[in-house]
Amino acid sequence: MNNYTPPYKITSKILKLSTQISEELTKLQFTGVEKVNPILRKKNRIKTLAGTLEIEGNFLGEEKITAILDGKRVLGTVKELAEVQGAIKAYEKLDSYRYDELDDLLQAHKILMDEILTTAGSFRSVNVKVAEHIAPKPSIVNELMMNLFSWLKNSDEHMLLKSC
């Protein structure tokens, strides 16, 4: 086992926010979240998919995602449509993924990106830079991820903080 711990500091703001989130989760547990209207569930699913895709620069939007879920054809680039289909498939399997299993992360990545990347389901093999951030070299990504997942599996930290 390694001694890796992600670099973070628990501040009073983090404690306050995590307490508020825990309180809201407790309320949901006692109000029966399973009883949520199926139409509301579908709307929330569409909003989640749209938000996830927008982060990656896909702006097909809620209307087109709704149409895709309803089995209709929509206009978009091959990549945009593949991203939507991949996100839908990955979200459908969400309950089967284990948060502390690296293989599950790679499987989710494969499902999500299978139509887009020939290397879907594996770590990158090239250098990348996002804005001013230079990511770690490809040769150490596997080790870094193994360390992170070992921490996720073995840390006594509260699950809410681990999820950040």
Q: What is the role of each PLM region?
A:
Residues 1-164:
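FIC/Doc superfamily catalytic core
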